[in-house]
């Protein structure tokens, strides 16, 4: 079960705003050895939680790619997410009311700052492997830049150094869908539910691609309505709205847009040059959201960066689905 780390001091955000207090939900697997040298930290993506054994099945667990008998695995729920960390559904201690849309905007750097505070509370001085895909890769990258001596090995999947105009446009389109749901502005916990469903359906088009749907959502030859692709989009939207919150999704997408390792560091190349970790960058050939060229850039400018490209029909979601291929590449480059 997840635990809660409570940071009682005011938590200042990159934009100058302050959270009066901060809670970070996290989970651990395995045991920390005496030398504290067996830590693997997993950073999760947009709507995931702090239990990677659930959403990265086959990669994390006993006798899996990352063996919990050998390693101490930590995963923390990010700020703004509705799985236990401080988020728009939380109570503002200064007002006694739910934050809602009064929650401050935050950045990927703020998320990384919260992870560092948690690691200090857990007395973890060094991380053997830091792993993250998509938005999780953004966090891992920032952390490796901010604390280069702390991270020994870094694995980045389907991510980038700066969120692209394409990615920002997709996120803005999803926020427009959420905002078009008039209930989004109400205080109820499930407000904006229909807007969130539409946003998820939009997002899915960038997570998959033409070939994904061509292979997985094929109709009978004479079908004239009630197409599988239509049903699938609605199903995925409803599936997310049952477990997630529209306001949290809105804020997390804004945080994703903020990602730019070069901000106030000269540029992205100079920022990436600060990373000391042995780094494996994994791209998915068919990824529309984070094209291969973005991972090629990372591998080129991270001093010890190496690039591997996975062939998959699943697009961006390949970083979650192609577990066997990922496992093989990780073991090819590292002794786990």
From Swiss-Prot:
Q: Which reaction does it catalyse?
A: L-homoserine + acetyl-CoA = O-acetyl-L-homoserine + CoA
Location(s), subcellular: Cytoplasm
Q: Out of the domains of life, which is the source?
A: Bacteria
Whether Cytoplasm counts among this entry's keywords is yes
* Chain sites annotated for binding substrate: 200, 317
Q: Which GO terms describe its biological process?
A: homoserine metabolic process; methionine biosynthetic process
Location of the active site: 134, 287, 316
Kindly indicate whether the keyword Acyltransferase belongs to this entry.
Answer: yes
Q: Which GO terms describe its cellular component?
A: cytoplasm
Query: What keyword terms does UniProt attach to this protein?
Result: Acyltransferase, Amino-acid biosynthesis, Cytoplasm, Methionine biosynthesis, Transferase
| Enzyme class (EC, first level) | transferase
Pathway field: Amino-acid biosynthesis; L-methionine biosynthesis via de novo pathway; O-acetyl-L-homoserine from L-homoserine: step 1/1
Q: Where is the AB hydrolase-1 domain?
A: 38-321
Provide the GO MF annotations for this entry: homoserine O-acetyltransferase activity
In the Enzyme Commission scheme, what number(s) does this protein have? 2.3.1.31
Say what the protein does. Answer: Transfers an acetyl group from acetyl-CoA to L-homoserine, forming acetyl-L-homoserine.
Complexes and interactors: Homodimer.
- Annotated family: Belongs to the AB hydrolase superfamily. MetX family.
Q: What is this protein called?
A: Homoserine O-acetyltransferase
